[in-house]
């Protein structure tokens, strides 16, 4: 549940303003002036709070909810109880996300741990760093020579910004994160502990020992990217590692040198992407997916969790398994194996 001690909802919202923001019409008889004080799950929502429902599993919770209003798809609208206003939309979850963004604006981007604006006396900023007005740097943060940081950006405690790194406006760099050899766009969120721009894993291997290959590329992070806690993004060997506009990367992801990730991709926790692989726009990688190097995953493709991708994936594909293959083929193989295993067990019992 939300706790105002940590994140307080925005005041002054009404049912009418919320419905307008979500692009949902109010039904006849609903009072647009009714105050909205928060959002909560169906089971706990109170008479001044909003909820949403888009899964038949929660039908019982919908039937007993006390919420002021509920965002629902046309399919579930008839099941909304009489005491709750049905706000009908084709995508309840997306509308609910818009509602939460209005109610809890401060949760949209991690802020400074300290109320004071400007540079904390406990931070270490090199005299040759260039800082725009209106930013915040928390105690323990380090900013190297030649670094540029835009207005509205927040550096958390003990964040380290290396020499000549450029960070755009309205970004959030979490506590203990490190950025070197990187160019970062606007409205980028880097969560605590992330490591961006360190050496890629490059060695010329041989019987006489392994020779380190200098990694002289950069990391380019475009606008509106979000990078999860303890994720690591290596800089390029000779070309750049790139993360495209609007891409969202979960916690504990490893992105190797020279990887190019397109726009609006989604990469879930535990993924590892080997060097020089390209993800085109709108690719989704489920949790713990492994991708070998020098591949191309086509635009709009989706890879099921725990899969291992060892060859190129055509655009618009849905693949899964180890090694990954089209989902229909994978399911058919799994079904066949299950039947063979069951038949083998019966044969052993009869024998």
From Swiss-Prot:
Q: What residues form the catalytic site here?
A: 257 (proton acceptor)
Stored PROSITE patterns? HEXAPEP_TRANSFERASES
- GO BP terms: lipid A biosynthetic process
According to UniProt, this protein's pathway is: Bacterial outer membrane biogenesis; LPS lipid A biosynthesis
What InterPro entries would the database entry show?
Hexapep, Hexapep_transf_CS, LpxD, Trimer_LpxA-like_sf, UDP_GlcNAc_AcTrfase_non-rep
Q: Which Gene3D superfamilies did the record assign?
A: Hexapeptide repeat proteins, MurE/MurF, N-terminal domain
Query: According to the lineage, what is the superkingdom?
Result: Bacteria
Reactions it catalyzes: a UDP-3-O-[(3R)-3-hydroxyacyl]-alpha-D-glucosamine + a (3R)-hydroxyacyl-[ACP] = a UDP-2-N,3-O-bis[(3R)-3-hydroxyacyl]-alpha-D-glucosamine + holo-[ACP] + H(+)
Give a GO molecular function annotation for the protein. Answer: N-acyltransferase activity
* Documented EC number(s): 2.3.1.191
Intrachain disulfide bonds: none
Q: Is Phosphoprotein given among the entry's keywords?
A: no
- Assembly state and interactors? Homotrimer.
Q: What does this protein do?
A: Catalyzes the N-acylation of UDP-3-O-acylglucosamine using 3-hydroxyacyl-ACP as the acyl donor. Is involved in the biosynthesis of lipid A, a phosphorylated glycolipid that anchors the lipopolysaccharide to the outer membrane of the cell.
Q: What does the sequence similarity comment in the record state about its family? A: Belongs to the transferase hexapeptide repeat family. LpxD subfamily.
Q: What is this protein called?
A: UDP-3-O-acylglucosamine N-acyltransferase
């Amino acid at each position: 549940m939300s706790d105002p001690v940590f994140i307080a909802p925005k005041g002054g919202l009404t049912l009418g303003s919320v419905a307008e923001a979500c692009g949902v019409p109010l039904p006849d008889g609903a009072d647009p002036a009714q105050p909205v004080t928060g959002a909560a799950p169906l089971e706990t929502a109170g008479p001044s709070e909003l909820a949403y429902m888009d899964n038949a599993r929660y039908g019982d919770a919908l039937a007993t909810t006390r919420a002021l209003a509920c965002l629902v798809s046309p399919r579930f609208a008839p099941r909304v109880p009489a005491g709750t206003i049905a706000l009908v939309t084709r995508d309840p979850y997306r509308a609910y996300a818009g509602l939460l963004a209005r109610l809890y604006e401060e949760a949209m981007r991690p802020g400074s741990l300290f109320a004071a604006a400007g540079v904390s006396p406990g931070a270490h900023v090199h005299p040759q760093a260039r800082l725009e007005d209106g930013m915040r740097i928390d105690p323990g943060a380090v900013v190297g020579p030649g670094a540029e940081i835009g207005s509205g950006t927040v550096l958390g405690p003990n964040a380290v910004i290396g020499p000549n790194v450029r960070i755009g406006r309205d970004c959030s760099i979490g506590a203990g994160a490190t950025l070197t050899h990187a160019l970062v766009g606007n409205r980028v969120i880097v969560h605590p502990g992330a490591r961006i721009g360190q050496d890629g894993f490059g060695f010329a291997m041989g019987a006489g020992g392994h020779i380190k290959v200098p990694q002289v590329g950069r990391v380019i992070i475009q606008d509106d990217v979000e990078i999860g806690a303890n994720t690591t993004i290596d800089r390029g060997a000779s070309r750049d590692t790139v993360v495209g506009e609007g891409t969202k990367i979960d916690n504990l992801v490893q992105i190797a040198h020279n990887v190019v990730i397109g726009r609006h991709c989604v990469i879930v926790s535990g993924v590892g992407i080997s060097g020089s692989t390209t993800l085109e726009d709108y690719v989704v990688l489920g949790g713990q997916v492994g991708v070998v190097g020098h591949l191309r995953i086509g635009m709009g493709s989706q890879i099921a969790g725990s899969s291992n991708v060892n060859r190129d994936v055509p655009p618009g594909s849905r693949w899964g398994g180890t090694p990954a293959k089209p989902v229909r083929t994978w399911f058919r193989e799994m079904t066949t194996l299950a039947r063979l295993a069951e038949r083998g067990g019966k044969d052993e019992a009869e024998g």
